[in-house]
From Swiss-Prot:
Residues 25-50, 111-170, 252-286, 349-427 are cytoplasmic. GO terms for cellular component: plasma membrane. It holds the Pfam family 7tm_1. Its main location: membrane. Residues 1-3, 72-89, 192-230, 308-327 are extracellular. GO terms for molecular function: G protein-coupled receptor activity. The chain crosses the membrane at residues 4-24, 51-71, 90-110, 171-191, 231-251, 287-307, 328-348. Residues 410-421 have a biased composition (Pro residues). Keywords: Cell membrane, G-protein coupled receptor, Membrane, Receptor, Transducer, Transmembrane, Transmembrane helix. It comes from Mus musculus (Mouse). This is Probable G-protein coupled receptor 150. Residues 402-427 are annotated as: Disordered. Orphan receptor. CDD domains: 7tmA_GPR150.
């Protein structure tokens, strides 16, 4: 009879008195020697995804800083003289554009950053969060585009018909905001919340949360939606911008072609002729600003919508087309439009800033000196001082008295003053 306390018949058991850490130890008793999985931090995503988030953060900070500066400059400077109703209308449109850029950058960049950093919402709030995010993105993009087109239209009417009927800026600005919200409703119904499966090894918080509904549908559904988005968000504003900027360029070209007439040699026959009308320098600056805003809108939004249309007509399956690398990169370029718009305004309209005047004066010294030397060399042969020009010749009234007796001609009047240097501030 065997001893019941023999070591040969005792079942091997773990020493329960010793604390064990199964999550960080190796299972040496297993045949394959596999490690027991322990708690690990969630993956952080690919480097391109992190770079995308960094660029979105930089653009968001730049957009908030620039547009806040524009709003403080236009809304807070009430201590100066009243600039007049026309300037008030232009300032009102610029304030609306700055507010639209703030709304667009916050709706696009801030919503994406919050979505990626905070992680997946609850399933009950997933669809609502997706639709609200797309509503903010589409409406902000549309409001900014509509106000850029409205500014170009207002400048076109102010240049072509200065004394004509004024544009109802407040009503059209309210209509632009309302139209942007209405046209942004369809994008809210083409997305749904879909959390990634838990078995996915390379899933990070916020990955593929909002997906389109076009994966199980035929391809033409996605193509129709892409066409609608391109026409409403890009083609229609570009058509209005092309009409307004085309008229602006025509007026600018006509007024510029009449300007060389003023530089022709002075003759007595031109004494009674009136000089051609030219655009004021401040109006030229606002015209240039409108053209720059239009070109910036086209340059920033054209690659994004081209990538969207290319993804819709590609041979790839219509899955998560919102998350393609090219479309995501073009979205960053589109959001950059909201950060560059205030810089354009500050470049063209900051003429009364003391630092800006010093910078323009320092940069314009060289070209001003060259223009003055050219004018002096051109007029040196036939231009003298006024008293030397008159003495010892008789004065004008003496010449008029002697015209009938001696038949002498009236001395020509002095030449007009040369135009100011082009480097001087327009303000």
């Amino acid at each position: 009879m065997e001893d019941p306390f023999s070591l040969a018949i005792l079942n091997p058991a773990s020493n329960l008195s010793v604390p064990t850490q199964p999550s960080w130890s190796l299972n040496l008793t297993s045949e394959q020697g596999a490690s027991v999985p322990g708690p690990h931090s969630p993956p952080r995503g690919p480097p391109s995804h992190r770079i995308h988030l960094v660029f979105l953060g930089i653009i968001l900070v730049a957009a908030v800083a620039g547009n806040t500066t524009v709003l403080c400059r236009l809304c807070g400077g009430s201590s100066g003289p009243w600039p007049g109703p026309k300037r008030r209308k232009m300032d009102f449109l610029l304030v609306q554009l700055a507010a639209a850029d703030l709304y667009a950058s916050g709706g696009t960049a801030l919503s994406q950053l919050a979505w990626e950093l905070l992680g997946d919402p609850r399933p009950a709030l997933g669809d609502l969060a997706c639709r609200l995010s797309h509503l903010l993105q589409a409406s902000g993009r549309g409001a900014s585009a509509h106000l850029v087109a409205l500014i170009a239209l207002e400048r076109q009417l102010a240049v072509r018909i200065p004394q004509g009927p004024q544009l109802p800026a407040r009503a059209l600005a309210a209509l632009s905001w309302l139209l942007a919200l209405l046209l942004a409703l369809p994008p809210t119904f083409v997305v749904r919340w879909d959390a990634p499966p838990s078995s996915t090894a390379n899933a990070w918080p916020g990955k593929h949360c909002c997906r389109g509904i076009f994966a199980p549908l035929p391809r033409w559904h996605l193509q129709v939606y892409a066409l609608y988005e391109a026409i409403v968000g890009f083609a229609a504003p570009v058509a209005l911008l092309g009409f307004s900027c085309g008229h602006l360029l025509c007026v600018w070209w006509q007024r510029g072609s009449q300007a060389p007439v003023a530089r022709m040699p002075w003759s007595p026959s031109m004494a009674r002729a009136s000089l051609p009308s030219a655009l004021p320098q401040a109006k030229v600056q606002s015209l240039k600003m409108s053209l720059a805003l239009a070109l910036l809108f086209v340059g920033c939004d054209l690659p994004y919508f081209a990538a969207r249309l290319a993804a819709a007509w590609s041979s790839k399956p219509a899955g998560d087309w919102e998350r393609e690398s090219l479309v995501a990169a073009m979205r960053v370029l589109e959001v950059a439009n909201s950060a560059i718009n205030p810089l354009i305004y500050l470049f063209f309209q900051a003429g009364d800033c003391r630092l800006w005047r010093r910078l323009r004066r320092r940069l314009g010294v060289l070209c001003c000196v060259r223009e003055e030397e050219a004018d002096i060399s051109e007029w040196a042969g036939d231009h003298q001082a006024l008293h030397r020009h008159r003495w010892p010749h008789p004065h004008y009234h003496h010449a008029r008295r002697e015209e009938r007796n001696q038949g002498c001609l009236r001395p020509p009047p002095p030449r007009p003053r040369p135009p100011p240097c082009s480097c001087e501030s327009a303000f």
